Amino acid sequence: MRINPTTSXPGVSTLEEKTLGRITQIIGPVLDVAFPPGKMPNINNSLXVKGRDTVGQQINVTCXVQQLLGNNRVRAVAMSATDGLMRGMEVIDTGAPLSVPVGGSTLGRIFNVLGEPVDNLGPVDTRTTSPIHRSAPAFIQLDTKLSIFETGIKVVDLLAPYRRGGKIGLFGGAGVGKTVLIMELINNIAKAHGGVSVFGGVGERTREGNDLYMEMKESGVINEQNIAESKVALVYGQMNEPPGARMRVGLTALTMAEYFRDVNEQDVLLFIDNISRFVQAGSEVSALLGRMPSAVGYQPTLSTEMGSLQERITSTKEGSITSIQAVYVPADDLTDPAPATTFAHLDATTVLSRGLAAKGIYPAVDPLDSTSTMLQPRIVGEEHYETAQRVKQTSQRYKELQDIIAILGLDELSEEDRLTVARARKIERFLSQPFFVAEVFTGSPGKYVGLAETIRGFQLILSGELDGLPEQAFYLVGNIDEATAKAMNLEVESKLKK
């Protein structure tokens, strides 16, 4: 991180110290640039191309140096369209990697990969900037304590708890509630932990990015009246951007998150949607640079690129970055190099199920498919572990019995199995929860449920103490006391109807 001086020293031009080169070749988003002998830029240095095209329009393209070719030439990848560039144009070596604004001024705003605001809300304070290429924290700075990151969402905290400073893979198709879950996590971390969030849209559809922004404004995650009160910064590199931009936009978002962790000493939530598109962009860049492809056509540097991003996402003694990454699995093949490389870095997986979403169970997190390395008795404690295992066993037994129920009906089951089914259906409904950010749609006030309350609720259902309550009493409530109160209300309503 560096503080930019507000003014230059009198009479000193910043360009006088810069090295000038010239474009010698343009192949799509890749430029070859020749520099004077002994004035070669370093790898990852940012180069600026400024000039006018054939019709006199201003061109301003930023590139990042990727290869040193010899004969005083470098190969750079452009971060924006190269339309209008010509051989012989002047290129300025900025002498440093790409730097982006960081700090409180980024909250509530939308940025591109270069750290430029793209939301038409005016300029951003750029006095504090940070380079996007940095090394991961040293071992001595890391926080080795294994601690749970409480989200206030029952199904996540009980069955697939997140690790503070961990990495979570979010698997979900279109329309199963991925965006709403992301927004609720952003909202809850801000309220419960006083933390902030950074959202990196890597290869996002522009429409989806716009929808997310609008929904965040509606739900109050972004405060339009007082933008500084917002809880999230957004960084987008859309699908129509060159691969260089899509490959680096994750680093821009991560750099903003690192500032909140290291300087403001906060717990930060970092969303990357979609980590597979980061890999895809890297593959395109690799091919453009002339590297030999590796397995399934991916870049040979896949593990290194993934590691350089993932290793920076960690807990230090100052604060933590907990990352939630959407993972696209090509053709549902988990052995594909892109998801396989991602899995090596994940601490937990949250799988969203279309079947649950169709039933109206939101969040539609699958209790059997979602996993976490944190769900161990020595980390979460015996009580939490036992409760989670019993919930999973009951849900699994219900899943096994569903075919029998569909063919023969409930009456053909044994007394024990009927009891299991009744409790499993209550558990399934109790795993749903009203969200703060969905209040507008559901009409129910949102609920944050602490871990102790969550465990107590499921223990009461499993013990049979609540067998007499109707199933619908457990649907879309917070803690178990609300379910009991709802059951009483339902009873009163049914008596009044009679």
Swiss-Prot record:
Q: Report what the protein is called.
A: ATP synthase subunit beta, chloroplastic
Cited PROSITE patterns: ATPASE_ALPHA_BETA
> Gene3D superfamilies per the record?
2.40.10.170, Bovine Mitochondrial F1-atpase, Atp Synthase Beta Chain, Chain D, domain 3, P-loop containing nucleotide triphosphate hydrolases
Q: Which residues form a coiled coil?
A: none
A biological process (GO) of this protein is: proton motive force-driven mitochondrial ATP synthesis
Q: Tell me the PANTHER family matching this sequence.
A: ATP SYNTHASE, ATP SYNTHASE SUBUNIT BETA, CHLOROPLASTIC
Q: How does it sit in the membrane?
A: Peripheral membrane protein
Chief place where the protein resides = plastid
KW Thylakoid (keyword) present? yes
Q: Which family does it belong to?
A: Belongs to the ATPase alpha/beta chains family.
Provide the top EC class: translocase
